[in-house]
């Protein structure tokens, strides 16, 4: 009985502590000489940032350094384990001249964190757990404490990347957690974002998931044009990763509008980048619609 009461008391204390946890956070910088952005994430941060250098170049913005630390499917908790173990499991990409370069395929979390005095560091949960708040509640303060300890700039803004719900036909192993229901997953992600913003002092959110969901209600969605057995469905290329055309473009526009407009004063609206340097070019009309979806999403999360 005594052991039970001690265990119960410890659990209550842990719950009470998590309820009180907040993080020290700072605003986005205003018109810095060089803006430095690091994404600590997984394949969904890859999807979100892949076309950001192209948008920056088209906007005439050449004073932004963007980098991403990538492990496929990496959770908040795993980032913390990677740090504790000092393992070199990350691929580290960096853009200093609006073009991605692979810096290392065997990087540690510290390699990325200490590479630059980052102004903005983005974090996110793995898509599997993106709508399960207990995983965010445990992982966010742990990872942020590591960032605060190791990042050269003690006033870096910590920004949350909101990811997207799977396509309705997705066969992702985690989709049953959400009843194989896209709207249920989307609502769960939104709820997690809202709670995390309040609990952990995360005012700035990159709402890629919101922008993608908005776009799914437009002609950009292909769910009425291809059979539901198609892998390329509802702006995904496999049921969960974004298509290399409109999907990734929408997400990059969302990153741009969230981070570049408030810091450097340039909106993504009217950006002329049409992916002509890739195999996935889009029309100016479609680009404009993607940009509008991104802007609408960002306004909803201001």
What are these regions (language model features)?
Residues 106-245, 257:
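Alpha-helical cap/lid subdomain in secreted, periplasmic
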Residues 2-68, 270-302:
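N-terminal secretory targeting modules
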């Amino acid at each position: 009985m005594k052991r039970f009461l001690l265990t119960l008391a410890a659990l209550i204390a842990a719950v009470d502590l998590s309820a009180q946890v907040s993080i020290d956070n700072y605003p986005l910088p205003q018109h810095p000489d060089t803006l430095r952005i690091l994404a600590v994430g997984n394949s969904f941060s890859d999807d979100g940032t892949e076309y950001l250098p192209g948008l920056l170049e088209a906007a005439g913005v050449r004073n932004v350094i963007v980098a991403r630390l990538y492990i496929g499917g990496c959770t908040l908790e795993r980032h913390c384990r990677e740090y504790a173990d000092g393992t070199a499991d990350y691929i580290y990409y960096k853009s200093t001249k609006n073009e991605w370069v692979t810096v290392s395929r065997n990087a540690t979390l510290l390699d990325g964190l200490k590479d630059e005095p980052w102004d903005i560091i983005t974090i996110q949960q793995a898509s599997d757990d993106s709508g399960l708040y207990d995983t965010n509640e445990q992982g966010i303060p742990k990872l942020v404490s590591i960032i605060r300890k190791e990042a050269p700039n003690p006033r870096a803004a910590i920004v949350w990347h909101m990811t997207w719900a799977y396509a309705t036909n997705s066969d992702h192993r985690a989709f049953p957690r959400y009843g194989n229901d896209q709207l249920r997953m989307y609502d769960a992600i939104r709820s997690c974002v809202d709670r995390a913003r309040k609990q952990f002092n995360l005012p700035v959110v990159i709402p890629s998931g919101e922008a993608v969901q908005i776009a799914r209600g437009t002609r950009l969605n292909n769910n009425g044009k291809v059979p539901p057995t198609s892998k390329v469905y509802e702006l995904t290329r496999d049921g969960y990763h974004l298509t290399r055309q409109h999907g990734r473009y929408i997400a990059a526009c969302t990153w741009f509008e969230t981070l570049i407009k408030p810091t450097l004063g340039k909106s993504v609206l009217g950006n002329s980048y049409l992916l002509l340097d890739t195999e996935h070019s889009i029309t100016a009309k479609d680009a404009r619609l993607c940009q509008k979806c991104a802007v609408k999403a960002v306004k909803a999360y201001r």
